[in-house]
Amino acid sequence: DCLKFGWKCNPRNDKCCSGLKCGSNHNWCKLHI
């Protein structure tokens, strides 16, 4: 299962959904541009 937009995440183990990226400075899934 992947982490959805706005969900807390770990930038060293990015499990955000496709099209999202874990931001290393705020630790939540944001849009990957």
Swiss-Prot record:
One of its GO terms (molecular function) is ion channel inhibitor activity. It is found in: Secreted. Keywords: Amidation, Disulfide bond, Ion channel impairing toxin, Knottin, Neurotoxin, Secreted, Toxin, Voltage-gated sodium channel impairing toxin. Its main location: secreted. Disulfide bonds join 2-17, 9-22, 16-29. The keyword Secreted applies. GO terms for cellular component: extracellular region. It comes from the Eukaryota. The modification Isoleucine amide is found at residue 33. Expressed by the venom gland. Inhibits voltage-gated sodium channels without significantly altering the voltage dependence of activation or inactivation. Preferentially inhibits human Nav1.7/SCN9A (IC(50)=2.1 nM) > human Nav1.6/SCN8A > human Nav1.2/SCN2A > human Nav1.1/SCN1A > human Nav1.3/SCN3A channels. Exhibits analgesic properties by reversing spontaneous pain induced in mice by intraplantar injection with OD1 (AC P84646), a scorpion toxin that potentiates human Nav1.7/SCN9A. Belongs to the neurotoxin 10 (Hwtx-1) family. 55 (ProTx-III) subfamily. Negative results: does not affect human voltage-gated calcium channels (Cav) or nicotinic acetylcholine receptors (nAChR) at 5 uM. The presence of a 'disulfide through disulfide knot' structurally defines this protein as a knottin. This is Mu-theraphotoxin-Tp1a. It comes from Thrixopelma pruriens. The lineage of its organism: Eukaryota, Metazoa, Ecdysozoa, Arthropoda, Chelicerata.
